[in-house]
Amino acid sequence: MRWRKFILCAVGALLASCSSESASRPDAGEVDEISSSENPVSSEWQLFSSSSFTEESSSSLFVHHPGFDPCRFNFGAGWQTAHEDPAFYEGLDYISVWLGDNDFFNAFEARMFDVTRQVNATPMIYAYVIAEFGKDHGLADCDTKKDGAFVTPNHCTDGAELIRNYFQDSILYRYREYAAGFREHIEFFANQDPDTVQFIWLVEPDFYQYSYSGSVQASKSSDHGGFAQNGGGVPDSMMGVYFSQIVDTIKAYLPASKIAIDISPWVLDQEAWYSNFDLSKVDFASTSGGRTAATSEKIRAANAATWKGIADLLKRPVLADAGYDAGGHGTGYNKAWGKTENLNARIADGVIGVTQMDPDSLYHVRASIVRSELSPTVWCTEN
């Protein structure tokens, strides 16, 4: 792969010295085991690979095949209108897109999917439907401020009422439109079967904020203004029912999809919260908000939840994200999520991938350099 070596050398001054010897991979025995017996993640993945996109390190022991793989750490990037050139994503494992702000499947996500086929990446969906539907009805994000004061009404004051009034006929409708739209789009590809194409759906970031427990907790906190849901939060058990209906809707059109349940690090009783969900429908746990800590065992410094604690509790791999903050504003490439020592520490905690939402054009090169230095994941049944 002469072209790859040329790129690596060209950016060597910025990123790493270009050498004929790659760093040796840490011994798999150094990684603590986390039991995944209830829902092992490995064999069902049908990885999209092509020799034209296979990246081989200078060590003959490491070969990278693009496409999400539970046996190694995965690197993803957010889909942006400023970066629709396939070369920007070449060599990455997945591309993510946020859905929810339209009633219909549109060209933006269709173009994302097309690029995933060109670079052999897995499509990832941030399904932010409830919040975006709420914005269409005048609700702000809970942490939105104007002139130093929290904006109301917001998702922490009226989100639960929105769900009660519109879940079946509007919120699930959007999920049907998106999933059916992807299915119809895939059918245009002669060599793709919508029944086997694997997506990863990150279902409803901040789902907890609409619940009874979330409302009670928020009302006692100044972080989001001390707001409570008008009319009360949705009963926690019903939040689990709504989650299952969303998953079933997605899989009715895209049955090979993998599902991630949201992690809200501020939840006071994580075990009680997740007990409301049918975890047999869940393949991953995922963060949202982009301000997660690569350098710490805590997901966020201000909260008690840890990467390993969530992975152990759910017995599921964890997907992290970085490079954006409140309101989805990009903050650029997060360097901490590119350092070998940080990544290996998080791999040992059960983290299986990171989405850089606002990377630069050298991101895929950095990923190609660090891959051979990373431990295998603790979730791989083939280790």
Language-model region placement:
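Structural preference for beta-strand elements that scaffold enzyme active sites
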Residues: R72-N74, D93-S96, N120-M124, Q198-L202, ...
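C-terminal motif of bacterial Sec signal peptides marking the signal peptidase cleavage site
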Residues: L14-S17
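Boundary/entry segment of secreted carbohydrate-active catalytic domains
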Residues: E56-R111, V119-A121, V354
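Acidic/polar, low-complexity intrinsically disordered N-terminal segments immediately downstream
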Residues: S22-G67
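Substrate-binding cleft of secreted/luminal carbohydrate-active enzymes
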Residues: H64-A82, T122, G289-A294, K308-N383
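Aromatic-lined carbohydrate-recognition surfaces of secreted/lumenal glycan-active proteins
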Residues: L202-E204, N230-E271, T287, K315-G327
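Substrate-binding cleft of extracellular glycoside hydrolase catalytic domains
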Residues: R111-Q245, A252-A256
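Aromatic- and acid-rich polysaccharide-binding/catalytic face
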Residues: V97, A272-A301, M357-P359
